[in-house]
């Protein structure tokens, strides 16, 4: 988080921490907790550092074809601009939002067009929550992650499905790359109640990370990254 985002995050965390223990016994405290939680979640969802991470992914991948960039509403236009301005090779995307969600028949037309090379990737909101299987995809950038275990497993599964077809260059799908962008804020200086709450919330992030690590080709590398994140938050909470 940048300085402004962190200040806002800490402010909402303080409100949540104040109402954390008593929220189940006091409806007003629960209301304050939930409102602050929603505002804070939006700070995490739209963290500017995620855009920096996307830029890094663009640089690291040699080919941006057959992909999905799963965005938050607040960042989809920013990501589209990054794609357009990607140098030396612009990334052409098909933008899909809740307002223009395609029918089942239109979905296959869109995927066929991507396979032909009409565009490199789908830039979408909630596409993985609409029962849309995407076996053709070779990579997915998850800027918007779900804290719901069932939803997350479904989203991951749609990308990892086998593709029986062949790409125009003759290649077959043998793997899929999933980039799950996680935000673990610094909690040093937080009160005991705030720390307890933050650690509990961070555990959900770590659980999701471990789920994807277990399905990866490089679980050792993933586990090492997860352990480093865990050390950071443990150090901040001590």
Regions found by a protein language model. Give the residues of each.
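Hydrophobic packing residues within well-ordered alpha-helices of enzyme cores
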Residues: 9, 79-83, 131
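Conserved RecA-like P-loop NTPase helicase motor core
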Residues: 92-217
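Alpha-helix N-cap/helix-start capping motif
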Residues: 3, 48, 73-74, 125-126, ...
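Interdomain hinge/linker at the junction between the two RecA-like core domains of SF2 helicases
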Residues: 1-11
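Conserved helicase/translocase motor-coupling segment
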Residues: 16-119
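Non-catalytic terminal extensions of ATP-dependent helicases
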Residues: 231-238
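Active-site-adjacent beta-strand anchor residues
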Residues: 2, 68-72, 142
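Short, flexible loop/turn segments with low-complexity composition
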Residues: 218-231
């Amino acid at each position: 988080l940048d300085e402004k985002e962190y200040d806002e995050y800490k402010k909402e965390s303080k409100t949540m921490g104040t109402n954390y223990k008593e929220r189940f016994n006091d409806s007003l405290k629960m209301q304050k907790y939930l409102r602050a939680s929603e505002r804070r979640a939006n700070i995490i969802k739209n963290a500017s550092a995620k855009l920096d991470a996307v830029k890094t992914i663009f640089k690291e991948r040699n080919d941006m074809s057959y992909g999905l960039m799963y965005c938050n509403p607040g960042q989809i236009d920013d990501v589209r601009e990054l794609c357009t301005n990607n140098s030396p090779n612009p990334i052409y995307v098909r933008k899909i939002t809740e307002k223009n969600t395609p029918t089942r028949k239109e979905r296959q037309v869109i995927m066929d067009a991507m396979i032909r090379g009409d565009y490199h990737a789908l830039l979408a909101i909630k596409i993985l929550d609409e029962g849309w299987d995407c076996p053709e995809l070779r990579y997915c950038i998850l800027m918007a992650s779900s804290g719901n275990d069932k939803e997350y497993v479904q989203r991951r599964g749609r990308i990892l499905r086998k593709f029986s077809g062949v790409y125009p260059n003759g290649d077959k799908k043998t793997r899929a790359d999933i980039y799950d962008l996680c935000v673990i804020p610094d909690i040093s200086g937080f009160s005991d109640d705030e720390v307890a709450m933050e650690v509990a919330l961070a555990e959900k992030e770590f659980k999701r990370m471990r789920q994807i690590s277990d399905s990866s080709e490089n679980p050792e590398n993933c586990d090492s990254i997860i352990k480093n994140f865990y050390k950071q938050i443990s150090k901040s909470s001590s």
